[in-house]
């Protein structure tokens, strides 16, 4: 396990982006713990501000309403320092969000195979209950085949955006959270960032 000590002048944030089910939250929490930094999740920030779940926001007001709230939440992070931040999977679709995230720090794209993403979402009851479907159906009502098609379609749209924004890309398909964190820390060292 790699441990990093921080210097007083190190104020770079580590920004985790990627599709749902790639490990942004679990990796972010462990990375923050190892670095002794605060962890923030933009989806949690939005839910706290709105006093309700993202699933409820999307069901009642639609995706455009949620994306507006997401834009406001990300804009409010300007000036954030010395944190680990996990974003919602679609946060980068808004060019302003992408600009703010890139300006905040070092961006790491977490990826996984479509098969792994679908399996992770289907096997995580909390994830299925909390995350809204892009098709408008409740996540618990979507078949594996429908979820696979939805995932393929969304990834085709988002991967080019993710790749342009990312400073590093890590495939989380076959490695543990601890191994992913170790890899992120190794890459920081090789980039000569003071992490």
Swiss-Prot record:
Annotated catalysed reactions: shikimate + ATP = 3-phosphoshikimate + ADP + H(+)
Binding site for ATP: 21-26, 131
Record-listed E.C. numbers: 2.7.1.71
Pfam families attached to this UniProt entry: SKI
Compartment list: Cytoplasm
Binding sites annotated in the UniProt record for substrate: 43, 67, 89, 158
Alphabetical keyword list: Amino-acid biosynthesis, Aromatic amino acid biosynthesis, ATP-binding, Cytoplasm, Kinase, Magnesium, Metal-binding, Nucleotide-binding, Transferase
InterPro entries (UniProt xref): P-loop_NTPase (IPR027417), Shikimate/glucono_kinase (IPR031322), Shikimate_kinase/TSH1 (IPR000623), Shikimate_kinase_CS (IPR023000)
Main localization of the protein described in the UniProt heading: cytoplasm
CDD domains xref list: SK
Region (Disordered): 128-148
Gene Ontology biological-process entries: amino acid biosynthetic process; aromatic amino acid family biosynthetic process; chorismate biosynthetic process
One CC-aspect GO term: cytosol
Pathway annotation: Metabolic intermediate biosynthesis; chorismate biosynthesis; chorismate from D-erythrose 4-phosphate and phosphoenolpyruvate: step 5/7
Assembly and oligomerization: Monomer.
Described purpose of this protein according to its UniProt entry: Catalyzes the specific phosphorylation of the 3-hydroxyl group of shikimic acid using ATP as a cosubstrate.
Protein name, as recorded: Shikimate kinase
Organism (species): Syntrophus aciditrophicus (strain SB)
């Amino acid at each position: 396990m790699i441990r990093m000590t921080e210097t007083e002048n190190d104020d770079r944030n580590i920004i985790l982006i990627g599709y749902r089910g790639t490990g942004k939250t679990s990796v972010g929490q462990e990375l923050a713990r190892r670095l002794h930094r605060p962890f923030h999740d933009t989806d949690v920030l939005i839910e706290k501000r709105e006093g309700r779940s993202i699933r409820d926001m999307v069901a009642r007001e639609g995706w455009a309403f949620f994306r507006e709230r997401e834009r406001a939440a990300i804009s409010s992070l300007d000036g954030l320092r010395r944190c680990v931040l996990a974003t919602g999977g679609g946060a980068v679709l808004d060019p302003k969000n992408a600009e703010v995230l890139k300006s905040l720090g070092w961006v790491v794209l977490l990826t996984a195979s479509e098969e792994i993403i679908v399996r992770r979402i289907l096997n995580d009851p909390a994830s299925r209950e909390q995350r809204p479907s892009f098709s408008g159906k409740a996540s618990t009502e979507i078949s594996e085949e429908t979820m696979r098609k939805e995932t393929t379609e969304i990834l085709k749209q988002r991967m080019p955006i993710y790749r342009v924004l990312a400073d590093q890309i890590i495939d989380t398909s076959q490695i543990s959270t601890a191994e992913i964190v170790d890899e992120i820390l190794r890459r920081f060292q090789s980039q000569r960032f003071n992490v």
